[in-house]
């Protein structure tokens, strides 16, 4: 890596640290002013943003990205409107900074308060989705954190255009423009250097594929909160309402197959497999043709009715396809389903469909994932759907946050201790 590149990344981190100290004491009104200005800028910049996005889409097609990957990259007028609305929504959310989490008075008269404070400087490493640029900027700003954004090469032009709007919004609210910065290169060396700046950056959040997250975890000297791949299961129990199960599986698989909370694996109890599997194959085909990768038992059931399928490999049951592909397996019990999910899933989002409350509670307690659903689609594992506002991502870690990371999850805490001259004996 060149000395100039290292110097540039270090300077970005130094400026972010200085900005974070200002943001930590910035009023809610000032932060909301910047957010509302950003929303207006997004809404008023549709044409230049779409033009920048088209440059990225053209490059993606040239380099052979899949349709699902291109969908994640693509902005449309509707998606830009939704993006602006999500920023406005963040402005309406309660400011977590300064919230008193607990207060107590010690026998010696000391008054202790534990209050929420920003983490400080957060580095966010992500790939194709340009909406992450805005979502992360909005959430970091509202929670009083400075953000260093490093997007992927797939969305470089779009991210650059969005970052310019963020800087304008911050300046308009008289906040430091360095509070949100985009690293202006996609060179891997810049990322590697950023990951060593533990005296300036307090947390790294990678969002992307397995190779990116492993690279960040292996090279970072800064604490990492991983937003790992979504290998998400739906289990249809023998006591399931089968029409409900159809609707849930179709939604979980086909509504947006390129996102991390889409279902990738389907487990079906043997007691309902003969009836359910042909029905779900037809329902999926009616919504959008889905390639079913089946174990031997499910393949035999579909073959009896001449329904299309292919043989699954062992790897298919732990793969995030991000496409119209679903791995299908028949299981003999709920215990087998739970064990399979805990072995093969990414601990992200998993669901059971059943009318048996006892079975549901067993599944909810036994599946070790960030979000576990009963009679609902895995697609609901989302910050907006959980009432958190736009999320910074969905953590599959156990520390410091798990599941959708909203404003509160972007805070730490500190102790405020008030006395009247007490000294320790």
From Swiss-Prot:
List, alphabetically, the InterPro entries matched. Ald_DH/histidinol_DH (IPR016161), Ald_DH_C (IPR016163), Ald_DH_N (IPR016162), Aldehyde_DH_dom (IPR015590), Glu-5-SA_DH (IPR012134), GPR_dom (IPR000965)
Which BP terms does GO give this entry?
Answer: L-proline biosynthetic process
Look up the EC number in the record and give it. Answer: 1.2.1.41
Location(s), subcellular: Cytoplasm
Q: In which pathway does it act?
A: Amino-acid biosynthesis; L-proline biosynthesis; L-glutamate 5-semialdehyde from L-glutamate: step 2/2
Q: What class of enzyme is it?
A: oxidoreductase
- Which keywords does the record carry? Amino-acid biosynthesis, Cytoplasm, NADP, Oxidoreductase, Proline biosynthesis
Q: Which reaction is catalysed here?
A: L-glutamate 5-semialdehyde + phosphate + NADP(+) = L-glutamyl 5-phosphate + NADPH + H(+)
Magnesium is among the record's keywords: no
Instruction: Cite a single GO MF annotation.
Output: NADP binding
Offer a single GO CC term for the protein: cytoplasm
Short name of one Pfam family for this protein? Aldedh
Show the CDD domains listed in the entry: ALDH_F18-19_ProA-GPR
Main localization category = cytoplasm
Q: What does this protein do?
A: Catalyzes the NADPH-dependent reduction of L-glutamate 5-phosphate into L-glutamate 5-semialdehyde and phosphate. The product spontaneously undergoes cyclization to form 1-pyrroline-5-carboxylate.
Protein family (similarity comment): Belongs to the gamma-glutamyl phosphate reductase family.
Listed HAMAP family: ProA
This protein's name? Gamma-glutamyl phosphate reductase
């Amino acid at each position: 890596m060149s000395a100039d590149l290292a110097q540039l990344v270090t300077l970005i981190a130094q400026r972010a640290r200085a900005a974070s100290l200002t943001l930590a004491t910035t009023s809610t009104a000032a932060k909301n002013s910047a957010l509302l200005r950003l929303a207006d800028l997004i809404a008023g910049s549709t044409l230049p943003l779409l033009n920048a996005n088209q440059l990225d889409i053209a490059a993606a097609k040239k380099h052979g990205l899949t349709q699902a990957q291109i969908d994640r990259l693509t902005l449309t007028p509707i998606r830009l409107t939704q993006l602006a609305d999500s920023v406005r929504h963040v402005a309406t959310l309660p400011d977590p900074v300064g919230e008193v989490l607990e207060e107590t008075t010690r026998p010696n008269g000391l008054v202790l308060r534990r209050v929420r404070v920003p983490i400080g400087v957060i580095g966010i490493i992500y790939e194709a989705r340009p909406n992450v640029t805005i979502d992360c900027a909005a959430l970091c700003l509202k929670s009083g954190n400075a953000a260093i954004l490093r997007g992927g090469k797939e969305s470089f032009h779009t991210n650059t255009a969005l970052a310019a709007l963020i800087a304008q919004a911050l300046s308009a609210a008289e906040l430091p423009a360095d509070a949100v910065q985009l690293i202006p290169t996609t060179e891997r060396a810049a990322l590697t250097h950023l990951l060593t700046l533990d005296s300036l950056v307090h947390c790294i959040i990678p969002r992307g594929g397995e190779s990116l997250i492993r690279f960040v975890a292996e090279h970072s000297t800064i604490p990492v909160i991983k937003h790992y791949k979504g290998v998400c299961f739906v289990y249809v129990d023998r006591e399931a309402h089968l029409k409900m199960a159809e609707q849930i599986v179709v939604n979980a698989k086909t509504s947006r197959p390129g996102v991390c909370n889409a279902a990738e694996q389907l487990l079906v109890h043997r007691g309902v497999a003969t009836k359910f599997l042909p029905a779900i194959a037809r329902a999926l085909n009616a919504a959008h043709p889905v390639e079913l990768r089946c174990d031997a038992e499910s393949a035999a059931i579909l073959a009896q009715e001449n329904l299309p399928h292919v043989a699954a490999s062992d790897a298919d049951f732990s793969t995030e396809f991000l496409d119209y592909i679903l791995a299908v397996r028949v299981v003999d019990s709920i215990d087998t389903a739970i064990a399979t999910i805990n072995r093969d899933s990414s601990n992200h989002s998993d669901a059971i469909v059943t009318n048996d409350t006892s079975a549901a509670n067993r599944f909810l307690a036994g599946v070790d994932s960030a979000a576990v659903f009963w009679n609902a689609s895995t697609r609901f594992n989302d910050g907006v759907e959980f009432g958190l506002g736009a999320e910074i991502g969905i953590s599959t870690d156990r520390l410091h946050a798990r599941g959708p990371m909203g404003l509160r999850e972007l805070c730490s805490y500190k102790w405020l201790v008030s006395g009247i001259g007490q000294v320790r004996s």
